[in-house]
Amino acid sequence: MSAQAQMRAMLDQLMGTSRDGDTTRQRIKFSDDRVCKSHLLNCCPHDVLSGTRMDLGECLKVHDLALRADYEIASKEQDFFFELDAMDHLQSFIADCDRRTEVAKKRLAETQEEISAEVAAKAERVHELNEEIGKLLAKVEQLGAEGNVEESQKVMDEVEKARAKKREAEEVYRNSMPASSFQQQKLRVCEVCSAYLGLHDNDRRLADHFGGKLHLGFIEIREKLEELKRVVAEKQEKRNQERLKRREEREREEREKLRRSRSHSKNPKRSRSREHRRHRSRSMSRERKRRTRSKSREKRHRHRSRSSSRSRSRSHQRSRHSSRDRSRERSKRRSSKERFRDQDLASCDRDRSSRDRSPRDRDRKDKKRSYESANGRSEDRRSSEEREAGEI
C-alpha cells in the first residue's frame, strides 16, 4: 500500500464516509447486511490473519474503515447489537480451528500408540517447557522494544532457568525410550493456532512461533471472542431485566385495575356517593356561575334603571314645574275672571234695579251676556288644553 493510500485510509477511519462530501460512498450504510459486522468491531479473522501462513484472503462482505468510523460515532447514541453477529462469526472460526487441532492430535496419536503413558507424560513435560521458553523470549523482545531493560533482564533469567529444566526433561525423556522411536516423537500441536511444533526445536524457533503474527492473531481472536461473550451476556441480562420490569409494571397495573373494579362492585354506595358529590360539586359550581351572572345582570339593570329613573325624575320635575306655573297662571286668570264676574254681577244688580229704564241699557245687558258666554267657552277650551298638557 502506498503512502497516499495509507493516508486516505487513516482519514476514512477518522472522519467516516463523508469526509470529502462524496455522496457516492454513502450509498451503502454500516447497517447494511453486505457490511461485515466483525470488521466494524475490528475483529474480523480476514484482517487479523492477513499476511500469515493461514491467510484467509478477502472477506466476502464489505470492509471499509469509513463505515467503521460511522458505526463508532452512531454507537455512542444507539445500540445496534452487532456483537451478536460478530460473536457468531468468531465462534464458527474458532470451532474450525479447534476441529483442525483435534484432527492433528489424532494423527499424532496414531503414530505414537506404542508409547507408554509414562513416556507420553515425559514428552508432554518437554513440550510445556518449550512453550514456556518461547513465551518468555517473546516477552523479552517486547520489553526490549519498549526500552524496559531491567524487566527484560529479569525475564531472561527466567528463560535460563526454563532452559535448564528443559535440558533435564529431554535427558529423562531420551533415556526412557529407544533411539529408533525417539526420532519419530518430535512433533506436537499448538493448542492456540493448531500449528505443529517440534519437540527438539531450538529456543529461537519457539520464540519466533509464540511471538509471530499467526499465534498472536489467534490469541487476539480468542480474547475478542471472550469479550464479546461477556458483552452479549451483559446486554441480554440487561434486556431481560427491562422485560421483567415492564412485565411487573403491567401486572401491577392489571392488579390495580382489578382491585378498583372489585372495590366498585363491592361498594356501590361509595361509588354512588362519589358520583353524587361530583355531581353536587358540578351543580354548585354551575349555580355559582349563574349567581355571578345574575348579579352582574342585576347590577347592569340597576345601573340602567337608576339612569332611567333619574331621567324620568328630571322630566317629572320639569313637568311638575311646568304644571305649577300653569296652575299659577290659571289661578291668576280665575281670580281676574272672578273679579270681572263680581264686577259684572254688581253691574247686573244695578241694572236690575234700574230695569227697563232705557233701550240703551237693554242693549248693554245683551252684550254682557254674550260676552260672558264667550268667556265661558274659551275658559272650557283652555281647561281642556291644560288637562291634556298635564297628562303629557
Curated annotation (Swiss-Prot):
Function: May bind to RNA via its Arg/Ser-rich domain.
Keyword Coiled coil recorded: yes
Protein name in the entry: Putative RNA-binding protein Luc7-like 2
Coiled-coil residue spans: 102-177
Modified residues (Phosphoserine): 18
Stretches the record annotates as Disordered: 235-392
GO molecular function terms listed in the Swiss-Prot or TrEMBL record: enzyme binding; mRNA binding; RNA binding
Cell location: Nucleus speckle; Nucleus, Nucleoplasm
5-hydroxylysine: residues bearing it: 266, 269
UniProt subunit comment: Interacts with SCNM1.
GO cellular component, one term: U1 snRNP
Source organism superkingdom: Eukaryota
Keywords: Coiled coil, Hydroxylation, Nucleus, Phosphoprotein
Species per Swiss-Prot/TrEMBL record: Homo sapiens
Any single biological process term in GO: mRNA splice site recognition
Family, per entry: Belongs to the Luc7 family.
Listed Basic and acidic residues bias regions: 235-257, 337-364, 377-392
Ranges annotated as biased composition (Basic residues): 258-321
